[in-house]
């Protein structure tokens, strides 16, 4: 049973990231971590506002921000392997208990994933979970996540990105969105 766990980039700002990674290390695998872009993606937003470059360039830079977060996570937990090719995650995750996905621009382009701020690492995690035929997707956020909230409600509150429902609508896997505190209290 492969589980994709998306760790929001804001976990770095709240200092919860190391604890979340440690909790994942104690969980039974196989697990694939999808990193949010965190402060690296925020710098892309700031730069786009200043320099007015297009959304395609911004989207690609945000994917690079996710790659930077993958490197950061690997530095904190060297026993977690980084894997770039999404196609190899399904089989590789059975050899290595925890993998960190470092998304590749070309692979996302080949999958016809549109460039824009409405598609963030939330939607990319949903896409990846479907692509590798995961059994579960867990999205861990710093924000408060109301119990029983629908995806649409979470999108309207800005907790999930605007495209998430599109990517998750045909999911053949369980999806859970939770706050970091709930994740840590149930997974460490």
Model-inferred region functions:
Residues 188:
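Phosphate/diphosphate-binding glycine-rich loops and adjacent basic-rich segments that engage nucleotide
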Residues 1-185:
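Nucleotide/pyrophosphate-binding catalytic subdomain
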């Amino acid at each position: 049973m492969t589980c994709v766990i998306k760790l929001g980039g804001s976990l770095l700002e709240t200092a919860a990231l190391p604890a979340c990674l440690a909790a994942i290390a104690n969980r039974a695998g196989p697990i694939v971590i999808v990193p949010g872009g965190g402060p690296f993606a925020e710098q892309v937003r700031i730069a786009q506002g200043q320099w007015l470059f297009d959304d395609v360039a911004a989207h690609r830079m945000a994917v690079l921000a996710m790659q930077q977060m993958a490197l950061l996570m690997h530095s904190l937990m060297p026993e977690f392997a980084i894997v770039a090719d999404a196609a190899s995650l399904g089989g590789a995750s059975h050899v290595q208990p925890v993998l960190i996905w470092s998304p590749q621009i070309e692979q996302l382009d080949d999958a016809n994933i549109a460039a824009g701020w409405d598609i963030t690492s939330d939607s990319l995690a949903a896409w990846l979970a479907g692509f590798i035929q995961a059994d579960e997707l867990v999205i861990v956020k710093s924000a408060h996540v109301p119990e029983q909230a629908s995806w649409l409600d979470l999108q309207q509150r800005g907790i999930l990105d605007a495209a998430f429902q599109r990517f998750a609508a045909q999911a053949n896997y369980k999806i859970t969105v939770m706050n970091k505190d709930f994740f840590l209290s149930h997974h460490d």
